């Protein structure tokens, strides 16, 4: 009984020691992510040529799942914003399709100024309307104040189809696109001109007369990735801890309108004015989101029925010239809505940014900058024509001033026809240029083809892109229109964040892996995707209990996204194969597959393939332990991020060791190997080995004897032994006669003669062989005896061990039987006593009543 208690105590101690240890556990399907710069792909509801060749059709999936977490957001340093800037530039280039160099046009041209068409009546009308901003002017009134575009008709000679024969050509150019020198001694108005930018860049002509359609796109995360969205009401482009976070698959639909200074057709207009600053405090990069309550719009128009004349210069080179013989009226833009009220609210918000209570809103002024035409003017594209609108009139209207924005030293000249530079107007004059500066790449010029017919664009104004100059606490504050195009995409996409889902996590548990040969089989995957991240804000313990469902959500989402994307790609493969965005869409699909395969390869290297919770044999050696009830997986992963490298290395080493152990275990568990011991062929192999050992030993012994014989032969004959022969007088007294006892001298002589006559070498060989045989026999006998003793001892120990096990089992059975017997007896006694109490209770009650009554 004592031995049994000792054994039970040892087992209990071992179990208690094993329970106290923590081991690394791998979890697959946890809602954790990290920032990513992967290429997103685009969807669009548009069906024009560009949309169908670059984006896949919109699936109208606006699913949004809220997350109970906090996350950092930044609008400008955002990979999604950088992608949008690059992609929209590609859209520009593909829409304009520059393909033919215009280097032949970079020659001297003889130009004559075109005649004007403005009448004195129009000039008088324009002069009488200078005193009011004309908020509700008609189209005729606005066009009456517009000046005429200065243009020239230029002729030049160039070799055409016949290289040795020059041909004269005639084209019409805007004067802003020419660099001219007046001729001396020539006809009046004639001048020598060159096309601008000939010396500093390569100009290209548009092959097709395409134009810029209103295009709306949305960016979508590839499979295995997601978009986080900040929904805080006080979000201003920078939030270290956004509290109202949700996860989406795609962004909202955004417009692709490119402008400078003023944002058009934005998708984030709300009933409040907001100021966004880069990094939360950068005054040079500011977005002012305008209140949609004021209904701010802008209407832009190019008057006249403009026509285009294709001029074939040589084979493969066609230049689209402007066909008119008189000057055209300037284009114009009319700003409509309550701009005064909107600008007043903007001024109040500018004061709140720095908490400048002493500054009057009258000291906050809107300004424009100087530099390239795209920077100094309100620049945008309207149906293929690039408008350059000088904002001085409108800025004077908002600031309630009448000054020349180009400098305070200049006087406002009101003597010239038309309005001067110091008037207030709700509309501005615009120039149209055919040669423009590229807004994305430095110094590159893109040629925009002219459009025929009437042009008009109506847009909503949703933002101002500015730089704020805080001079001092009480001084004037200048709000300067900024030409930074990236602010457009920071405004549109700044509340989104592209993240990569990392569904593999590590945490310590007290469960150690069972290292048996069985493995879990692959499970089927169904359900959706965004619900997978819905558990990001829940505690680790609650999330871990639903890992199977979450991992199914993850893979199902990946497969569904891949299926949708592949179907769209297959439908448009003929169109996608030649476009840059088509390649990016395919790249997004490949990236998702690579990511999923990489995750599965990592799990497989740790022995955790197709497992949602995988226990390991690697001990947890770190002090960090999770709080399963009040810590999210995202918080835990950020806490142990520095330990991931060490943990993965230990997991790989443990898996390699487990593979080796499993291989050995399978060999021991192989019954075919066990029955092979009873095979005669197996034993014949061992017999062969033993026979070879004996033959080798005998061969070595024979070689040793042979070597001894050769050595003796080389030494020569041995000398004869000197034997003393006794005489008859010295014959020993044997107490008898000659016939009784002793050896006669004649017999000794015979033996001596025999010995002397037998060769000594043969005797040595015989003796050596006899001695060797005796030694071998003795050695074999000793080995057999030792082996027999060992076998007897092992059998004895085995019998003793079996006897002890039998006694222990018998003792345990007796103890269990005795304990069961005692427990049963006690239980029976308790039941009997309870039964007696119930049976005897009436009698005891009766006896008690008799005692009381008696």
Swiss-Prot record:
Q: Which organism is it from?
A: Simian immunodeficiency virus agm.grivet (isolate AGM gr-1)
Cytoplasmic-side segments: 727-854
Transmembrane intervals:
706-726
Additional remark text:
This is an African green monkey isolate.
Instruction: Describe the task this protein carries out.
Output: The surface protein gp120 (SU) attaches the virus to the host lymphoid cell by binding to the primary receptor CD4. This interaction induces a structural rearrangement creating a high affinity binding site for a chemokine coreceptor like CCR5. This peculiar 2 stage receptor-interaction strategy allows gp120 to maintain the highly conserved coreceptor-binding site in a cryptic conformation, protected from neutralizing antibodies. These changes are transmitted to the transmembrane protein gp41 and are thought to activate its fusogenic potential by unmasking its fusion peptide.
Q: Where is this region: V2?
A: 154-198
Q: Where is this site: Cleavage?
A: 522-523
Known CDD domains for this protein?
Answer: HIV-1-like_HR1-HR2 (cd09909)
The residue ranges for the Extracellular side of the membrane come to 21-705
The segment annotated MPER runs over: 667-688
What is the protein's name according to its record? Envelope glycoprotein gp160
Region annotation (V3) maps to 300-332
Q: Where is this motif: YXXL motif?
A: 717-720
Which residues of this chain are annotated as glycosylation sites? 35, 68, 115, 136, 153, 168, 182, 199, 244, 255, 265, 271, 283, 295, 305, 355, 400, 409, 458, 472, 478, 630, 646
Q: Where is this region: V1?
A: 111-153
Disulphides: 42-55, 99-207, 106-198, 111-154, 220-250, 230-242, 300-333, 382-457, 389-430
Keyword Transmembrane appears in the UniProt entry: yes
Q: Which SUPFAM superfamilies match?
A: gp120 core (SSF56502), Virus ectodomain (SSF58069)
Pfam families, A to Z:
GP120, GP41
What would you give as a GO molecular function for this chain, any one? structural molecule activity
Q: Which UniProt keywords apply?
A: Apoptosis, Cleavage on pair of basic residues, Coiled coil, Disulfide bond, Fusion of virus membrane with host membrane, Glycoprotein, Host cell membrane, Host endosome, Host membrane, Host-virus interaction, Membrane, Signal, Transmembrane, Transmembrane helix, Viral attachment to host cell, Viral envelope protein, Viral penetration into host cytoplasm, Virion, Virus entry into host cell
Region (Immunosuppression) residue ranges read 586-602
Q: Which GO terms describe its biological process?
A: membrane fusion involved in viral entry into host cell; symbiont entry into host cell; virion attachment to host cell
GO CC annotations on file: host cell endosome membrane; host cell plasma membrane; membrane; viral envelope; virion membrane
Question: Where is the region V4?
Answer: 389-430
């Amino acid at each position: 009984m004592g031995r049994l208690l000792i054994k039970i105590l040892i087992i209990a101690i071992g179990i208690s020691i094993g329970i106290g240890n923590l081991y690394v556990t791998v979890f697959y399907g946890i809602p954790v992510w990290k920032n990513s710069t992967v290429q997103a792909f685009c969807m669009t509801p548009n069906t024009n040529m560009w949309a169908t060749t670059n984006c896949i059709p919109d699936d109208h999936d606006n699913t949004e799942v809220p997350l109970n977490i906090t996350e950092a957001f930044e609008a400008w340093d955002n990979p999604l914003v950088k992608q949008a800037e690059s992609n929209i530039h590609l859209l520009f280039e593909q829409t304009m399709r520059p393909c033919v160099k215009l280097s032949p046009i970079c020659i001297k041209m003889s130009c004559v100024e075109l005649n004007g068409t403005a009448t004195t009546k129009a000039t008088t009308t324009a002069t009488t309307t200078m005193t009011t901003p004309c908020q509700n002017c008609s189209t005729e009134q606005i066009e009456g104040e517009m000046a005429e575009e200065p243009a020239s008709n230029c002729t030049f000679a160039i070799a055409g189809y016949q290289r040795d024969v020059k041909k004269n050509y005639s084209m019409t150019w805007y004067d802003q696109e020419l660099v001219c020198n007046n001729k001396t001694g020539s006809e009046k108005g004639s001048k020598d001109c060159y096309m601008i930018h000939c010396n500093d860049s390569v100009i290209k002509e548009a092959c097709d007369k395409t134009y810029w359609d209103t295009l709306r796109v949305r960016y979508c995360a590839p499979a295995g990735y997601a978009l986080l969205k900040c929904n805080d009401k006080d979000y201003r482009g920078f939030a270290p801890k956004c509290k109202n976070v949700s996860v989406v698959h795609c962004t909202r639909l955004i417009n692709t309108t490119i402008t400078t200074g003023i944002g058009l057709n934005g998708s984030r207009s709300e009933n409040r004015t907001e100021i966004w600053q880069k990094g939360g405090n950068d005054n040079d990069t500011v977005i002012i989101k305008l209140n949609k309550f004021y209904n701010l719009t802008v209407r832009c128009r190019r008057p006249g029925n403009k026509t285009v004349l294709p001029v074939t210069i040589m084979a493969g080179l066609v230049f689209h010239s402007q066909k008119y013989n008189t000057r055209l009226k300037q284009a114009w833009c009319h700003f409509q809505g309550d701009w005064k009220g909107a600008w007043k609210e903007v001024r109040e918000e500018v004061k709140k940014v720095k908490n400048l209570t002493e500054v009057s809103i009258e000291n906050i002024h809107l300004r424009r900058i100087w530099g390239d035409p795209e920077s100094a003017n309100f620049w945008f594209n309207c149906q293929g024509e690039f408008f350059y609108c000088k904002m001085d009139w409108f800025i004077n209207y908002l600031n309630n001033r009448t000054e020349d924005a180009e400098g305070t030293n200049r006087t406002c000249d009101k003597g010239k026809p038309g309005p001067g530079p110091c008037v207030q107007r709700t509309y501005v004059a615009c120039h149209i240029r055919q040669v423009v500066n590229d807004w994305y790449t430095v110094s590159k010029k893109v040629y925009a083809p002219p459009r025929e017919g009437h042009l008009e664009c109506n847009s909503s104004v949703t933002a101002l892109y500015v730089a704020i100059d805080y001079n001092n606490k009480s001084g004037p504050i200048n709000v300067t229109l900024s030409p930074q195009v990236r602010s457009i995409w920071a405004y549109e996409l700044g509340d989104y964040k592209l993240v990569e889902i990392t569904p593999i996590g590590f945490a310590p548990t007290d469960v150690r892996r069972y290292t048996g040969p069985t493995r879990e089989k692959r499970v089927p995957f169904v359900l959706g995707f965004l619900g997978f991240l819905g558990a990001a804000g829940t505690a680790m313990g609650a999330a871990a209990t639903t890992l199977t469902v979450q991992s199914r959500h993850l893979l199902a989402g990946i497969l569904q996204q891949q299926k949708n994307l592949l179907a769209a790609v297959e439908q448009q493969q003929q169109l996608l194969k030649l476009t840059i965005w088509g390649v990016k869409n395919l790249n997004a699909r490949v990236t998702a597959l690579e990511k999923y395969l990489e995750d599965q390869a990592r799990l497989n290297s740790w022995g955790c393939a197709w497992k949602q919770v995988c226990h390991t044999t690697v001990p947890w050696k770190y002090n960090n332990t999770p709080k399963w009830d009040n810590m999210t997986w995202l918080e835990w992963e950020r806490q142990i991020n520095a330990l991931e490298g060490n943990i993965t290395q230990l997991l790989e080493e443990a898996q390699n060791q487990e593979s080796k152990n499993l291989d050995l275990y399978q060999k021991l568990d192989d019954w075919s190997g066990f029955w092979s011991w009873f095979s005669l062929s197996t034993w014949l192999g061992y017999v062969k080995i033993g026979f070879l050992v004996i033959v080798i030993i005998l061969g070595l012994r024979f070689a040793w004897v042979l070597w001894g014989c050769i050595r003796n032969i080389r030494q020569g004959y041995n000398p004869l032994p000197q034997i003393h022969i006794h005489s008859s007088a010295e014959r020993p007294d044997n107490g008898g006669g000659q016939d009784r006892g002793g050896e006669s001298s004649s017999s000794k002589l015979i033996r001596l003669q025999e010995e002397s006559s037998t060769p000594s070498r043969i005797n040595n060989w015989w003796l050596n062989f006899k001695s060797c045989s005796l030694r071998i026999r003795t050695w074999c006998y000793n080995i057999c005896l030792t082996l027999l003793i060992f076998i007897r001892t092992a059998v004895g120990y085995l019998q003793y061990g079996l006897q002890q096990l039998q006694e222990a089992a018998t003792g345990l059975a007796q103890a269990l039987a005795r304990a069961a017997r005692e427990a049963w007896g006690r239980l029976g006694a308790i039941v009997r006593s309870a039964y007696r109490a119930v049976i005897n209770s009436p009698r005891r009650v009766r006896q008690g009543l008799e005692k009381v009554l008696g």
